Amino acid sequence: VVAQSDGCAPVVEAFQNHQDSTSFWHKSNTIALGLNVPGPLGGYWILKILSESNGIAVTAQETSLEINTENFRKRIGIDASTEIGVVWSAYEELTEKKWITPGEKVVLFATGIERR
């Protein structure tokens, strides 16, 4: 699964358009700074792995990142940084669409801690 903010989603765009490589995402804008990668060097390999694994790529609405980050913090108890709002949004969407099935084990990567 690839999850990106709709403010910077070059991998999702390439995946949805069945492209073999990513294009530079001009005017990238996201509060999830760790995911602000408008020109991923490994775009080709990411897309190849997604294709070979029957993966999926989804975007999270930039306007929902803060609330999704807070929802994750309350539910899981980890004071994660805003990037988790993208991850949590994708998890909720894929669970709702039954792409993630009930009882399936899922690992959500929270790679940053909020500094206060």
Question: How should each PLM-predicted stretch be described?
Answer:
Residues 2-80:
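Active-site/ligand-binding loops adjacent to catalytic centers
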Residues 23-26, 85-116:
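Phosphate-binding loop/pocket of nucleotide- and phosphate-handling active sites
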